[in-house]
Amino acid sequence: MLPQVWAAAERAVAAGMHLCLSTGRPAFGRALGYAQRLDPGGWHIFQNGASIVNVATGDSVSEALPTELLLELVATSRRLGRILEVYTDSEYATESGDRRAVEHAAMLGVPYVQRDVLSLSTQVVRAQWVVPLDGQAAVMAEPHPGMSLHPAGSPGMPDTMFISVTRAGVSKGGAVRRVAARYGLETDQAMMVGDGENDVSAMRVVGYPVAMGNAEPAAVAASRFQVGHVNDGGLAEALELAMVLP
């Protein structure tokens, strides 16, 4: 992130605000580092709301992906040869040797390790399809009973679509409610800054939804405020806005 964003975050925390990272990424690698720097004593939302972790204590109020649903996904992945990643709060696994799987590990900031996706020893909270951009529609059209799909792209891998799979009903919006309750706040006192389709559920439950200048149309439509592009320090602008709103 840009230096002015970190400076604005420090001012916000010093003013008594709770800052919460809300991301599709897991609570390890680069995303964990961002959360720890953003608000080192706070609760943060990872994995599209499936993983809610206090980065100071390691406590978790996460949502499990039921085993029977996981087994269905694994069977489909092995049958089609499609990249599937499986996540707990603190680690992940993939059986794929495809270059997208390798590149994604680097983007997450963790070593690439090929391993049995059913070998994880703690509670699974999410799976993720990793597909070419032109493969998104087919995956989204497939039946996923009992599950919610959360598609998102990344400028770090512009030719790839990441489709998170959680238990049905899990969303960033639900996670925002749970984090707000941890702080004794109502969601109408909260701000959500978003730019993607997977941010919309959270933007709809807060009192101050903000769209980045690079936001997708769905995020813009869900917003009350707009700030600059992420590459131009728009997040710092949003944090400054938060400090002057009633």
Language model features: what each stretch is:
Residues 2, 165-246:
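Mg2+-dependent phosphoryl-transfer enzymes with acidic/Ser/Thr/Gly-rich catalytic loops
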Residues 3-104:
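Active-site phosphate-binding/coordination module
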Residues 10-14, 78, 143, 204, ...:
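Anion (oxyanion) recognition and catalysis
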Residues 30-32, 55-56, 96, 139, ...:
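Short glycine-/acidic-enriched loop or helix-start segments at secondary-structure transitions
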Residues 38-40, 48, 56, 143-146, ...:
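Short, structured coil segments at secondary-structure junctions
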Residues 49, 133-134, 153, 213-217:
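Short, polar loop motifs at secondary-structure junctions
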Residues 80-83, 87-193, 197-205:
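Conserved acidic, metal-coordinating active-site core of Asp-based
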